[in-house]
Amino acid sequence: MEKELRPGRRTSASLLGKISVVVLKTLAALVLIALLAVFVTSVSPIYDFAEPRPFSGPDIFNPYWDGGDSAFCWKRANFHTHTRVKGILNECEHWPDETDAAYRKFGYDIVTFSNHNELTVHPYDPLLQVNVYEHGYNLFKYHKLVFGCSDVNLFDHLVPLFASQKQFQLDLLGKESDFIQMNHPLRTIGTSEDHMRKLGGYRIMELDSGKSKENEYWDWALSAGHYSFGLANDDLHFPDRSSAIAVRCNFLCCPSARYEDIRKTLLGGCYYAMRVPDYGRGDWEVKYERNRTFRRSSGSASTDRQSTSPCRARPTASR
Protein backbone atom coordinates (compact mmCIF):
# COMPACT_ATOMS: atom_id res chain seq x y z
CA MET A 1 0.00 0.00 0.00
CA GLU A 2 1.34 3.41 -1.00
CA LYS A 3 2.23 5.66 1.82
CA GLU A 4 0.10 8.76 2.19
CA LEU A 5 1.81 12.10 1.75
CA ARG A 6 2.61 13.84 4.93
CA PRO A 7 0.82 17.17 5.55
CA GLY A 8 3.99 19.15 4.79
CA ARG A 9 4.50 17.37 1.48
CA ARG A 10 0.84 17.84 0.51
CA THR A 11 1.19 21.56 1.19
CA SER A 12 4.36 21.84 -0.96
CA ALA A 13 2.79 19.92 -3.85
CA SER A 14 -0.32 22.07 -3.69
CA LEU A 15 1.78 25.26 -3.67
CA LEU A 16 3.85 24.10 -6.65
CA GLY A 17 0.68 23.28 -8.52
CA LYS A 18 -0.74 26.73 -7.89
CA ILE A 19 2.51 28.40 -8.96
CA SER A 20 2.54 26.35 -12.17
CA VAL A 21 -1.02 27.40 -12.96
CA VAL A 22 -0.17 31.08 -12.38
CA VAL A 23 2.95 30.83 -14.56
CA LEU A 24 1.05 29.12 -17.38
CA LYS A 25 -1.76 31.68 -17.23
CA THR A 26 0.77 34.53 -17.27
CA LEU A 27 2.58 33.06 -20.28
CA ALA A 28 -0.71 32.53 -22.08
CA ALA A 29 -1.71 36.14 -21.38
CA LEU A 30 1.65 37.43 -22.65
CA VAL A 31 1.37 35.36 -25.83
CA LEU A 32 -2.17 36.64 -26.36
CA ILE A 33 -1.04 40.25 -25.84
CA ALA A 34 1.87 39.76 -28.27
CA LEU A 35 -0.40 38.26 -30.92
CA LEU A 36 -2.90 41.07 -30.42
CA ALA A 37 -0.13 43.68 -30.77
CA VAL A 38 1.09 42.05 -33.99
CA PHE A 39 -2.46 41.91 -35.34
CA VAL A 40 -3.30 45.52 -34.48
CA THR A 41 -0.07 46.87 -35.96
CA SER A 42 -0.28 44.72 -39.10
CA VAL A 43 -3.10 46.73 -40.64
CA SER A 44 -2.22 48.35 -43.96
CA PRO A 45 -3.71 48.84 -47.42
CA ILE A 46 -3.18 46.06 -49.94
CA TYR A 47 -1.21 47.45 -52.86
CA ASP A 48 -1.58 46.40 -56.47
CA PHE A 49 2.02 47.02 -57.52
CA ALA A 50 2.69 47.99 -61.10
CA GLU A 51 4.87 45.77 -63.24
CA PRO A 52 8.57 46.76 -63.13
CA ARG A 53 9.57 49.13 -65.94
CA PRO A 54 13.32 49.31 -66.58
CA PHE A 55 14.76 52.69 -67.49
CA SER A 56 14.62 53.61 -71.14
CA GLY A 57 15.38 56.57 -73.33
CA PRO A 58 18.22 58.11 -75.34
CA ASP A 59 19.89 60.06 -72.51
CA ILE A 60 22.15 59.23 -69.57
CA PHE A 61 21.56 61.24 -66.39
CA ASN A 62 24.79 62.76 -65.04
CA PRO A 63 24.36 64.08 -61.46
CA TYR A 64 27.80 65.72 -61.51
CA TRP A 65 27.41 68.02 -64.50
CA ASP A 66 26.36 71.06 -62.42
CA GLY A 67 28.62 70.46 -59.45
CA GLY A 68 30.14 73.94 -59.35
CA ASP A 69 33.79 74.42 -58.46
CA SER A 70 34.75 70.84 -57.70
CA ALA A 71 38.11 71.90 -56.27
CA PHE A 72 36.53 73.43 -53.17
CA CYS A 73 32.98 72.11 -52.82
CA TRP A 74 33.58 68.64 -51.35
CA LYS A 75 32.40 68.05 -47.78
CA ARG A 76 32.80 64.81 -45.88
CA ALA A 77 29.61 63.57 -44.21
CA ASN A 78 28.04 60.84 -42.09
CA PHE A 79 24.25 60.76 -41.90
CA HIS A 80 23.52 57.66 -39.81
CA THR A 81 24.75 58.56 -36.33
CA HIS A 82 23.44 57.49 -32.93
CA THR A 83 24.09 59.36 -29.69
CA ARG A 84 23.05 59.29 -26.08
CA VAL A 85 19.56 60.68 -25.50
CA LYS A 86 17.56 61.57 -22.41
CA GLY A 87 15.87 58.54 -20.93
CA ILE A 88 16.81 54.95 -20.19
CA LEU A 89 16.76 53.57 -23.75
CA ASN A 90 20.12 54.36 -25.32
CA GLU A 91 22.17 52.82 -28.11
CA CYS A 92 25.20 55.02 -27.54
CA GLU A 93 26.89 56.24 -24.37
CA HIS A 94 28.16 59.50 -25.88
CA TRP A 95 26.20 62.75 -26.11
CA PRO A 96 25.78 64.60 -29.44
CA ASP A 97 28.51 67.15 -28.69
CA GLU A 98 31.00 64.37 -27.88
CA THR A 99 30.09 62.40 -30.99
CA ASP A 100 30.28 65.49 -33.20
CA ALA A 101 33.71 66.37 -31.77
CA ALA A 102 34.92 62.82 -32.46
CA TYR A 103 33.97 63.11 -36.13
CA ARG A 104 35.50 66.58 -36.50
CA LYS A 105 38.88 65.13 -35.50
CA PHE A 106 38.70 62.94 -38.61
CA GLY A 107 37.89 65.85 -40.90
CA TYR A 108 34.13 65.43 -41.22
CA ASP A 109 32.22 68.58 -42.19
CA ILE A 110 28.66 67.26 -41.85
CA VAL A 111 27.35 65.04 -39.05
CA THR A 112 23.63 64.42 -38.62
CA PHE A 113 22.14 62.68 -35.60
CA SER A 114 19.63 59.98 -36.52
CA ASN A 115 18.50 58.46 -33.25
CA HIS A 116 15.69 55.94 -33.16
CA ASN A 117 12.26 57.59 -33.19
CA GLU A 118 13.59 60.87 -31.81
CA LEU A 119 14.66 64.21 -33.31
CA THR A 120 18.00 65.31 -31.87
CA VAL A 121 18.88 68.99 -31.49
CA HIS A 122 22.25 70.05 -32.87
CA PRO A 123 24.53 70.51 -29.84
CA TYR A 124 25.94 73.97 -30.61
CA ASP A 125 24.77 75.54 -33.89
CA PRO A 126 21.06 75.90 -34.82
CA LEU A 127 22.09 76.73 -38.39
CA LEU A 128 23.42 73.18 -38.74
CA GLN A 129 20.23 71.55 -37.47
CA VAL A 130 19.02 68.65 -39.61
CA ASN A 131 15.70 67.12 -38.62
CA VAL A 132 16.21 63.41 -39.20
CA TYR A 133 15.48 60.27 -37.23
CA GLU A 134 15.63 56.52 -37.73
CA HIS A 135 12.11 55.17 -37.97
CA GLY A 136 11.25 51.66 -36.88
CA TYR A 137 11.11 49.58 -33.71
CA ASN A 138 9.78 46.48 -35.49
CA LEU A 139 11.21 43.01 -34.98
CA PHE A 140 12.51 42.72 -38.56
CA LYS A 141 14.76 45.83 -38.48
CA TYR A 142 12.91 47.54 -41.32
CA HIS A 143 14.46 50.95 -40.64
CA LYS A 144 14.33 54.23 -42.56
CA LEU A 145 16.01 57.61 -42.15
CA VAL A 146 13.32 60.28 -42.35
CA PHE A 147 14.69 63.69 -43.43
CA GLY A 148 13.06 67.10 -43.14
CA CYS A 149 10.21 66.19 -40.81
CA SER A 150 8.77 68.34 -38.03
CA ASP A 151 7.74 65.45 -35.79
CA VAL A 152 8.29 61.73 -35.23
CA ASN A 153 5.76 59.21 -36.51
CA LEU A 154 5.58 56.33 -34.02
CA PHE A 155 3.37 54.04 -36.08
CA ASP A 156 5.09 50.83 -37.10
CA HIS A 157 4.25 47.25 -37.98
CA LEU A 158 5.80 44.95 -35.39
CA VAL A 159 6.19 42.28 -38.08
CA PRO A 160 6.46 43.99 -41.50
CA LEU A 161 6.43 40.79 -43.48
CA PHE A 162 4.63 41.88 -46.65
CA ALA A 163 5.60 44.36 -49.37
CA SER A 164 2.30 46.21 -48.89
CA GLN A 165 3.16 46.92 -45.25
CA LYS A 166 6.57 48.26 -46.20
CA GLN A 167 5.15 50.42 -48.99
CA PHE A 168 2.48 51.80 -46.65
CA GLN A 169 5.20 52.94 -44.25
CA LEU A 170 7.14 54.61 -47.06
CA ASP A 171 4.01 56.41 -48.24
CA LEU A 172 3.03 57.46 -44.72
CA LEU A 173 6.47 58.81 -43.86
CA GLY A 174 6.89 60.41 -47.29
CA LYS A 175 3.87 62.63 -46.70
CA GLU A 176 5.46 64.05 -43.56
CA SER A 177 9.04 64.54 -44.74
CA ASP A 178 11.27 65.78 -47.55
CA PHE A 179 12.75 62.40 -48.44
CA ILE A 180 13.50 58.95 -47.06
CA GLN A 181 16.55 56.71 -46.98
CA MET A 182 16.00 52.95 -46.83
CA ASN A 183 18.45 51.58 -44.28
CA HIS A 184 20.50 48.37 -44.56
CA PRO A 185 18.02 46.20 -46.54
CA LEU A 186 20.37 43.21 -46.30
CA ARG A 187 19.88 43.19 -42.52
CA THR A 188 16.12 43.61 -42.81
CA ILE A 189 14.51 40.22 -42.31
CA GLY A 190 12.21 39.27 -45.16
CA THR A 191 13.44 41.82 -47.70
CA SER A 192 13.67 39.93 -50.97
CA GLU A 193 14.36 40.66 -54.62
CA ASP A 194 10.61 40.64 -55.20
CA HIS A 195 10.15 43.33 -52.54
CA MET A 196 12.92 45.51 -53.96
CA ARG A 197 11.37 45.31 -57.43
CA LYS A 198 8.07 46.55 -55.99
CA LEU A 199 8.91 49.16 -53.36
CA GLY A 200 9.20 52.85 -54.24
CA GLY A 201 8.97 56.25 -52.65
CA TYR A 202 12.43 56.37 -51.07
CA ARG A 203 15.10 58.58 -52.65
CA ILE A 204 18.24 57.09 -51.12
CA MET A 205 19.40 53.59 -50.25
CA GLU A 206 22.01 52.87 -47.63
CA LEU A 207 24.54 50.79 -49.53
CA ASP A 208 27.00 50.19 -46.70
CA SER A 209 26.52 50.65 -42.98
CA GLY A 210 29.66 49.02 -41.67
CA LYS A 211 28.11 45.57 -41.24
CA SER A 212 26.69 44.80 -44.66
CA LYS A 213 26.83 45.76 -48.32
CA GLU A 214 23.57 46.29 -50.19
CA ASN A 215 24.71 46.70 -53.81
CA GLU A 216 22.67 43.68 -54.92
CA TYR A 217 19.50 45.11 -53.38
CA TRP A 218 20.17 48.48 -55.00
CA ASP A 219 20.65 46.82 -58.37
CA TRP A 220 17.37 44.91 -58.05
CA ALA A 221 15.53 48.18 -57.44
CA LEU A 222 17.34 50.08 -60.20
CA SER A 223 16.71 47.29 -62.69
CA ALA A 224 12.99 47.55 -61.94
CA GLY A 225 12.96 51.30 -62.61
CA HIS A 226 13.13 52.56 -59.00
CA TYR A 227 15.79 55.24 -59.22
CA SER A 228 17.65 56.22 -56.06
CA PHE A 229 21.07 57.39 -54.97
CA GLY A 230 23.26 55.57 -52.46
CA LEU A 231 24.95 56.53 -49.20
CA ALA A 232 27.56 54.78 -47.06
CA ASN A 233 27.37 55.49 -43.32
CA ASP A 234 29.00 54.25 -40.15
CA ASP A 235 25.64 53.60 -38.45
CA LEU A 236 27.63 54.74 -35.45
CA HIS A 237 26.94 53.46 -31.94
CA PHE A 238 30.48 53.36 -30.51
CA PRO A 239 32.60 56.45 -31.29
CA ASP A 240 35.25 55.14 -28.89
CA ARG A 241 35.94 52.10 -31.08
CA SER A 242 38.41 52.65 -33.89
CA SER A 243 36.78 50.02 -36.11
CA ALA A 244 33.34 51.66 -35.79
CA ILE A 245 34.00 55.31 -36.64
CA ALA A 246 35.26 57.01 -39.82
CA VAL A 247 35.19 53.80 -41.85
CA ARG A 248 32.31 54.86 -44.12
CA CYS A 249 31.63 58.33 -45.49
CA ASN A 250 30.16 60.43 -48.27
CA PHE A 251 31.67 63.40 -50.08
CA LEU A 252 29.09 65.99 -51.12
CA CYS A 253 29.74 68.78 -53.59
CA CYS A 254 27.79 71.15 -51.41
CA PRO A 255 28.14 74.93 -50.79
CA SER A 256 27.50 74.64 -47.04
CA ALA A 257 26.59 72.24 -44.24
CA ARG A 258 23.11 73.71 -43.87
CA TYR A 259 20.12 71.48 -44.44
CA GLU A 260 18.78 73.29 -47.50
CA ASP A 261 22.10 72.72 -49.29
CA ILE A 262 22.42 69.14 -48.03
CA ARG A 263 18.91 68.33 -49.23
CA LYS A 264 19.51 69.76 -52.70
CA THR A 265 22.77 67.84 -53.06
CA LEU A 266 21.42 64.51 -51.82
CA LEU A 267 18.36 64.69 -54.05
CA GLY A 268 20.43 65.85 -57.02
CA GLY A 269 23.08 63.16 -56.62
CA CYS A 270 26.23 65.29 -56.75
CA TYR A 271 28.17 63.19 -54.24
CA TYR A 272 29.95 59.88 -53.90
CA ALA A 273 29.97 57.25 -51.16
CA MET A 274 32.99 55.30 -50.02
CA ARG A 275 34.57 52.89 -47.58
CA VAL A 276 37.66 53.95 -45.63
CA PRO A 277 40.22 51.61 -44.00
CA ASP A 278 40.47 51.58 -40.22
CA TYR A 279 43.82 53.34 -40.30
CA GLY A 280 46.07 52.38 -37.41
CA ARG A 281 43.75 49.59 -36.25
CA GLY A 282 43.42 51.01 -32.75
CA ASP A 283 46.29 53.51 -32.89
CA TRP A 284 44.23 56.70 -32.70
CA GLU A 285 47.05 59.08 -33.59
CA VAL A 286 47.71 57.18 -36.81
CA LYS A 287 44.00 57.14 -37.56
CA TYR A 288 43.68 60.91 -37.01
CA GLU A 289 46.70 61.70 -39.15
CA ARG A 290 45.78 59.38 -42.02
CA ASN A 291 42.22 60.74 -42.10
CA ARG A 292 43.43 64.34 -42.07
CA THR A 293 45.78 63.56 -44.96
CA PHE A 294 43.02 61.64 -46.69
CA ARG A 295 40.65 64.58 -46.21
CA ARG A 296 43.09 67.07 -47.74
CA SER A 297 43.57 64.87 -50.80
CA SER A 298 39.90 63.90 -51.22
CA GLY A 299 39.69 65.58 -54.59
CA SER A 300 42.39 63.37 -56.10
CA ALA A 301 42.82 59.66 -56.65
CA SER A 302 43.92 57.48 -53.74
CA THR A 303 44.93 53.84 -53.79
CA ASP A 304 43.79 52.98 -50.26
CA ARG A 305 40.19 54.03 -50.50
CA GLN A 306 37.31 52.18 -52.06
CA SER A 307 34.59 54.35 -53.54
CA THR A 308 31.17 53.47 -54.83
CA SER A 309 29.36 55.88 -57.08
CA PRO A 310 25.88 56.81 -55.93
CA CYS A 311 24.73 56.89 -59.53
CA ARG A 312 24.89 54.06 -62.02
CA ALA A 313 25.21 54.94 -65.68
CA ARG A 314 21.61 54.26 -66.57
CA PRO A 315 19.29 55.99 -69.02
CA THR A 316 16.62 58.26 -67.65
CA ALA A 317 13.23 56.66 -67.26
CA SER A 318 10.64 57.48 -69.87
CA ARG A 319 7.61 59.35 -68.57
Regions found by a protein language model. Name each.
Residues 8, 42-185, 190-192, 198-200, ...:
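A metal-dependent hydrolase metal-coordination microenvironment
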Residues 1-71, 238-319:
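C-terminal functional module detector
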Residues 125-126, 195, 284-289:
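Charge-rich, low-complexity amphipathic helices
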